[in-house]
Amino acid sequence: MWTGYKILIFSYLTTEIWMEKQYLSQREVDLEAYFTRNHTVLQGTRFKRAIFQGQYCRNFGCCEDRDDGCVTEFYAANALCYCDKFCDRENSDCCPDYKSFCREEKEWPPHTQPWYPEGCFKDGQHYEEGSVIKENCNSCTCSGQQWKCSQHVCLVRSELIEQVNKGDYGWTAQNYSQFWGMTLEDGFKFRLGTLPPSPMLLSMNEMTASLPATTDLPEFFVASYKWPGWTHGPLDQKNCAASWAFSTASVAADRIAIQSKGRYTANLSPQNLISCCAKNRHGCNSGSIDRAWWYLRKRGLVSHACYPLFKDQNATNNGCAMASRSDGRGKRHATKPCPNNVEKSNRIYQCSPPYRVSSNETEIMKEIMQNGPVQAIMQVREDFFHYKTGIYRHVTSTNKESEKYRKLQTHAVKLTGWGTLRGAQGQKEKFWIAANSWGKSWGENGYFRILRGVNESDIEKLIIAAWGQLTSSDEP
Ligand SMILES: *[C@@H]1O[C@H](CO)[C@@H](O)[C@H](O)[C@H]1NC(C)=O
Ligand SMILES: *[C@@H]1O[C@H](CO)[C@@H](O)[C@H](O)[C@H]1NC(C)=O
Ligand SMILES: *[C@@H]1O[C@H](CO)[C@@H](O)[C@H](O)[C@H]1NC(C)=O
Ligand SMILES: *[C@@H]1O[C@H](CO)[C@@H](O)[C@H](O)[C@H]1NC(C)=O
Ligand SMILES: *[C@@H]1O[C@H](CO)[C@@H](O)[C@H](O)[C@H]1NC(C)=O
């Protein structure tokens, strides 16, 4: 009985081999040479697959450790095959050309390559010759049965996300769909937008809050708890490099509300600044915060409701739709109705000249607690875009080629409070709470926490604030 089975199995195998030989001879592949080159490929299920010298690895190109993403349909076997270093140990589900491509590529003459008549494969799907697909920030064209991809560095990098999330850095990273598909270059070009502070700004005298030095500062402080309804949450600058305008308008709005004791609680319009602050003419193309504060002092802004953000920041008709004139008694009035005609109030809000707050942590805390949120100029690096939750500190990429993945640029945000947390090792970790301008889906509801007291990402280097210009008639 057992012998009978053996004969059956044997004859089955011989038929299989014979059929494969027939098949291959039709395709003019030198089976003989392949067999003598390495006999180990003759073992078990490997045999059947090994004789198909397909395009898998050539097209998908991954020969690293087990990579579940690097899988493709193996047509002949109606199965999935992998193309990665795991195949060194476990061969049953490896792409047929794993060895030839990843281990012995040079020995293969180019004429053995064509197997599929035309086109390329990706995730088990066939694409015509000349097809273009997008892979994150790169586009790949199927040409000569291979995907040829552009080599941009992408803003979202899974290795970096993984590195942050596996490490003990105090924060976690996420893949944001709004950044997926952008190059690193474009991320820095479109999502930040504050010019490095001018020497004039940096040489400003530092003011210290008038609170006595001995004031007890709480462990935890959030501006929106102390002044509910008077402070303003993060907006989304989208692909408009204008953090210079978003942070300035937001700090000014909070401070006018606090100073007027809730009489004027409108958020101020960053679009008004972007479109009308003429010296920053390329509003979505970065600007300086000195000019923003100058504009708030000299011209004033209407509310965000009156002059909302344009849907398409790249629209060419992005001209200034608001003007103000002086009434001769130190107040300015709008000369045009609101661009958003549903909003009737086109009141102009103005500020005092800005002042610099000391970089001393305690001084910054006193200033926020006494007068409201402040503007902070920070240096943003590539990992910051991935921030999801926790206390941010810069994580240096461990990638060997990390130079090309690194970038650094100035950004402006709003500090709204602080706190203390016990770290994983039980140590005390102090943080600032800051509002970014990347919408509420980013970070902690649009906010982030960042290490406090160690000048992380230069967050304490330049702190700016201003007073609202309220006349006696404005006083509540
Ligand atoms: C065949 O491949 C195995 C595993 O890749 C290798 O260890 C062996 O040296 C190869 N033999 C020949 C003759 O190339
Ligand atoms: C990241 O998100 C995008 C869009 O939401 C998605 O298409 C992509 O597969 C994700 N990438 C990773 C590595 O998770
Ligand atoms: C905006 O327009 C410029 C020039 O026309 C272009 O280079 C850029 O990619 C556009 N940005 C977006 C986000 O569409
Ligand atoms: C910061 O200012 C406080 C007083 O407000 C002072 O006690 C402290 O030493 C200063 N810290 C530094 C680093 O200068
Ligand atoms: C913060 O760091 C920057 C750059 O390292 C430095 O220029 C600046 O003086 C530092 N500021 C403080 C307050 O330590």
From Swiss-Prot:
The record marks 49-50 as: Cleavage. It has been suggested that the active SMB domain may be permitted considerable disulfide bond heterogeneity or variability, thus 2 alternate disulfide patterns based on 3D structures are described with 1 disulfide bond conserved in both. It comes from the Eukaryota. It holds the Pfam family Peptidase_C1. Glycans are attached at residues 38, 175, 314, 360, 455. GO terms for cellular component: basement membrane; extracellular space; lysosome. One of its GO terms (molecular function) is cysteine-type endopeptidase activity. SMART domains: Pept_C1, SO. Residues 59-107 form the SMB domain. It is found in: Secreted, Extracellular space, Extracellular matrix, Basement membrane. Mediates adhesion of proximal tubule epithelial cells via integrins alpha3-beta1 and alphaV-beta3. This is a non catalytic peptidase C1 family protein. Antibodies against TINAG are found in sera of patients with tubulointerstitial nephritis, a rare autoimmune disorder that causes acute and chronic renal injury. This is Tubulointerstitial nephritis antigen. It comes from Homo sapiens (Human).
